[in-house]
């Protein structure tokens, strides 16, 4: 295939973003269906297709690369120390395969930011792009902190009381998990800057928001999650990513006023 044809295909994809999004994600879904290693459940793949269409059509390859990075890195860290976590009864269900509830618990905030960028007022787009990156930075930070903490945390304590608790306890944190989570959130923010979705300052805002939101999520887990049956891990994840996006936007808005 020569360069002129590739250029024409690329121009057409930009001219018809929703159509190209459907074609691209259908192709990737077909590849996933025949891949020997399944990272999602069958329904999870269907919902991921919807998410992928939204992200590609609204944000193009830049936004798509961010969500792919979150998905593959998040799936990889979930499998860290898998056998040990399964033996202790603290591993993710379905051996880490994600279902629809996981897809939207992790990405609903990002999808709404992407749709708002595509259809909302132009003055909001820079803030919404920051919210998009920060939501995934937050979720990757949370996932990494949790999985590394469960696998390698030497001392695990409840965030609200600092009392020692077993690994995998809701609201538990560890030094190892916290540091790994911070690094993961920073890495995702750097990627967002690298593809041009956020400014250099956005790296700081996104990383700081991810750190704050991840710890707030631990507080929710320690204080409320066991009291309210409807407050599932997926609902908490949705709250977590919303907080990450909102905090990042709030920090940037405050910085602009100073």
From Swiss-Prot:
Compartment(s) where it occurs, according to its Swiss-Prot or TrEMBL record: Cell membrane
Pfam families the UniProt entry points to: DUF92
Transmembrane segments: 14-34, 53-73, 110-130, 185-205, 238-258
Family indicated by similarity: Belongs to the TMEM19 family.
Entry protein name: Uncharacterized membrane protein sll0875
Membrane topology: Multi-pass membrane protein
Keywords: Cell membrane, Membrane, Transmembrane, Transmembrane helix
InterPro entries named among the record's database cross-references: DUF92_TMEM19
A GO-annotated cellular component: plasma membrane
């Amino acid at each position: 295939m020569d360069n002129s044809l590739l250029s024409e295909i690329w121009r057409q994809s930009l001219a018809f973003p929703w159509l190209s999004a459907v074609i691209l994600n259908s192709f990737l879904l077909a590849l996933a269906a025949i891949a020997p290693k399944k990272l999602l459940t069958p329904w999870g793949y269907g919902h991921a297709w919807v998410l992928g269409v939204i992200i590609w059509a609204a944000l193009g390859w830049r936004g798509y690369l961010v969500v792919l990075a979150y998905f593959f890195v998040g799936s990889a860290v979930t499998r860290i120390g898998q056998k040990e976590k399964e033996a202790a009864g603290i591993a993710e269900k379905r051996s880490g395969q994600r279902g629809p509830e996981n897809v939207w618990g992790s990405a609903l905030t990002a999808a709404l930011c992407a749709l708002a960028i595509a259809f909302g007022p132009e003055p909001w787009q820079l803030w919404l792009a920051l919210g998009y990156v920060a939501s995934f930075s937050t979720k990757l930070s949370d996932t990494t902190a949790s999985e590394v903490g469960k696998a390698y945390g030497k001392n695990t304590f409840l965030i609200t009381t600092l009392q020692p608790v077993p690994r995998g306890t809701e609201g538990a944190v560890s030094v190892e998990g916290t540091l790994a989570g911070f690094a993961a959130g920073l890495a995702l923010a750097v990627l967002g800057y690298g593809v041009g979705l956020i400014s250099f300052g956005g790296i700081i805002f996104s990383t700081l928001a991810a750190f704050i939101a991840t710890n707030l999520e631990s507080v929710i887990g320690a204080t409320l999650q066991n009291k309210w049956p409807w407050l599932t891990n997926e609902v908490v994840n949705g709250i977590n990513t919303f907080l990450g996006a909102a905090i990042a936007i709030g920090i940037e808005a405050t910085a602009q006023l100073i």
